[in-house]
């Protein structure tokens, strides 16, 4: 399933992103969207970043480049 950042840009694995709340830069590592509706996939904390131990909702991220 496609996931979108807060600006409605498609997010893909390996892509650089910025965490909107902190401005920290990271790389999208995994997205666990199995059995989620499109709304849930956008708002649930289902994204893992390479250098962070937390999960993020795609709507909390901004795609870079």
Identify the residue ranges that each predicted region occupies.
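Short hydrophobic/aromatic patches at helix-to-coil boundaries
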Residues: 62-65
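Mixed-charge, Lys/Arg-rich low-complexity intrinsically disordered regions
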Residues: 1-16
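Basic/aromatic-rich interaction segments and small domains that mediate binding to polyanionic partners
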Residues: 16-59
């Amino acid at each position: 399933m496609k996931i979108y950042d807060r600006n409605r840009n498609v997010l893909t694995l390996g892509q650089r992103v910025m965490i909107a709340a902190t401005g920290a830069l990271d790389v999208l590592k995994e997205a666990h969207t199995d059995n989620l509706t499109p709304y849930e996939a956008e708002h649930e904390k289902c994204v893992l970043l390479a250098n962070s131990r937390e999960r993020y909702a795609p709507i909390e991220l901004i795609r870079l480049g």
